[in-house]
Amino acid sequence: DPVIAIEPGGKVVRSWGRGRYVMPHAIRVDPQGNVWTTDAASSHVIKYSPTGAVLLDIAVGGQPTPCRNNFCGTTDIAFAANGHLFIADGYANARVLEYTPDGAKVREWGTPGTGPGQFNLPHSIQIDRAGVVYVADRENARVQRFDRAGTFLGEWTAYGKTFGLEAD
């Protein structure tokens, strides 16, 4: 099973997700304790209860080339204070998508490229307490910063090919 719950002392409490993944990529826990995962190969984003029941599967189906209308290589997820979910759709689509807690798409931003607001593999995403969205644009060797509506705020370029982020 690709999802395993372990107590602080190291005891495995439960596991789940067998047969649901081709290439599991990210796992995050939302403020309510639900477990969210991404699968970069099948391009699903799945929400589980803390006990492993599937609560939501944002499934887009196949991956037609060039994948722009569907997820195509989801890499990470982050949660806004209002409960919205932000998804880094990185391996082929080079964009960020925002969804409501029940899976309705709100907006997206980003295109392939090297300019501000463009991506070459958005690999990780986080949102800080002020609502700033940070995207690790791995192959452009930078972290870009946006407001929640996708307006470019700036970038950091001194840290190499960042593949993971964590907000504090």
Provide a role label for each language-model segment.
Residues 1-168:
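Eukaryotic scaffold repeat domains enriched in small/polar residues
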